[in-house]
Design a protein with these regions (language model features):
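Ligand-binding clefts of soluble mixed alpha/beta catalytic domains
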Residues: 5-9, 20-22, 70
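Short, solvent-exposed loop/turn segments at the edges of secondary structure
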Residues: 10-11, 36, 43-44, 72-74, ...
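Conserved phosphate-handling catalytic cores of large alpha/beta enzymes
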Residues: 25-34, 40-78, 82-88, 96
Length: 474
């Protein structure tokens, strides 16, 4: 489904299916409702080739056709290679227990290397002796490599032994502060861009009034800046510094809560205008996409994107944080553990709108506790941000540190436009990300006899409760 979508196209993917016609012990009749396992590709009109795995020359011919198709049309193509599994699913599996009829045939079936050697000998390409020699050399090479591996102790592996692999070694996690402040000039340049609309561009009146004009007034007044403005400042400043930004998710262009509006629409012509693409001719690329409704597929794609483009700020946003459960496999198998398993770090950012705002049980919790349970050995960062400026700094810190770690952010909902949750100019130009913030409402710390550690929306709820109770010692 993603193959022809803007923001998710690859220019065509060649899908190779090594079809053993069995899954552990499950036969096709129990595994799917379609005739072929590749029938799902029909939904995007991808050509599908079914080829006999016992005929390597035809497999090569089909592969060449598939490659030429992909290069010419930039679309997906599928090759379904019909094969069989000679042994069990693993070293301890005995397939005769569940498919005795099938494996009684396979047991006496000649090896492909034998039948193919006879085929090329009949064609006069190689003699039988030459074919046997090629096979012997290959087996000798494999045995030598296997013997070498057995000699090495896994516990004594050195970084040099990963040379040529995809492993990436990086510095350990550090709590050292990172300079993420920007100059007033940079802030003004980004603010000017996101509050400027081209002449004769007919912005929807309500958007002009509540977004463009309002942001313009906030900028002229010198703040305070809300969540959406702070995010735009983070994106824009990174773009000016040479860092590309990619944001992908359900309704991400507007923002589920209409707080972002990264794309303006002409109500007459339906033309689109991207303010963050028009800050400076020298800026880097800004990409923002509304995604299809498969969290699993899209987060997987964006995670891969973050691996291929490590210098990019790559963000996946859930429509509501609850929906991350649809992508739990990507989170568990890759985001939380890929660095430990394969030395493959990622700086993917996940924005998960979180908070009980009266929208029902499926739109309230990003399951903060799940992500905290997955944290171990500095594998990722989980942040419940309290102020727009801290959101600004944590996004910029993601790029400016000397290592990569996934960043999980519990995004707010009610705080997006809250006057209480707004930041001053100096919070962007003379500050950094702080893991602990002072309570700015406390005038005399000596009178405090109780300290509560909290974050995010909880802080504002507690401040409100403290004011109502006229309590000054907490």
């Amino acid at each position: 489904n993603m193959s022809q979508l803007p923001g998710y196209r690859t220019g065509g993917t060649i899908h190779l299916v090594v079809n053993n016609q069995i899954g552990f012990t499950t036969l096709p009749a129990d595994a799917r409702s379609t005739r072929y396992c590749t029938d799902m590709a029909k939904m995007v009109d991808a050509p599908i080739f079914h080829v006999n795995g016992e005929d390597p020359l035809t497999v090569i011919e089909v592969a060449q056709i598939a490659l030429e198709f992909r290069q010419k049309f930039r679309r997906d193509v599928v090759i379904d290679i019909y094969c069989y599994r000679r042994h069990g699913h693993n070293e301890t599996d005995e397939p005769l227990f569940t498919q005795p009829d099938l494996y009684s045939i396979i047991k006496v079936h000649p090896l492909l290397s034998t039948t193919f050697a006879a085929q090329v000998s009949a064609l006069g390409t190689v003699t039988a002796d030459e074919a046997a020699g090629i096979k012997a050399k290959l087996l000798e090479k494999l045995e030598a490599a296997f013997s070498e591996v057995k000699k090495k102790s896994e516990s004594k592996k050195k970084k040099s032994e990963f040379a040529g692999s995809t492993a990436i070694f990086q510095p350990p996690y550090s709590h050292e502060p990172v300079n993420t402040a920007i100059t007033v000039a940079t802030l003004d340049k980004v603010a000017a861009a996101i509050t400027t609309v081209p002449e004769k561009f007919n912005v929807v009146p309500k958007i002009k009034r509540t977004v463009v004009d309002r942001r313009l007034q906030v900028w002229k007044d010198g703040g305070p800046y809300d969540w959406g403005f702070a995010e735009a400042l983070a994106f824009g400043s990174l773009l000016l510094e040479g860092t590309p930004v990619r944001l992908s998710g359900q309704d991400s262009r507007r923002g589920t809560f209409s707080h972002r509006n990264s794309v303006l629409y002409d109500e007459v012509t339906r033309d689109r205008y991207f303010p963050l693409k028009n800050i400076s001719p020298e800026q880097e690329t800004f990409c923002v996409y509304n995604s299809p409704l498969s969290e699993y597929a899209v987060l997987g794609f964006d995670y891969g994107y973050s691996m291929d483009f490590p210098s990019m700020l790559c963000i996946w946003e859930a429509q509501f944080g609850d929906f991350a459960n649809g992508a739990q496999i990507i989170i568990d198998q890759f985001i939380a553990s890929a660095e430990a398993k394969w030395r493959r770090p990622s700086s993917i950012v996940m924005l998960l709108p979180h908070g009980y705002e009266g929208q029902g049980p499926e739109h309230s919790s990003a399951r903060l506790e799940r992500f905290l349970q997955l944290c171990a050995e500095d594998n990722m960062q989980v942040c419940n941000i309290t102020t727009p400026a801290q959101y600004f700094h944590v996004l910029r810190r993601q790029i400016h540190r000397g290592y990569r770690k996934p960043l999980i952010i519990m995004s707010p909902k009610s705080l997006l436009r809250s006057e209480d949750a707004a930041s001053r100019v100096e919070d962007f130009t003379n500050a950094r990300f702080e893991e602990i913030l002072d309570d700015p409402t406390i005038k005399d710390p000596k009178k405090v006899n109780r300290v509560v550690f909290c974050s995010g929306k909880v802080y504002y709820d507690l401040v409100r409760g403290r004011e109502e109770a006229k309590q000054t010692a907490t």
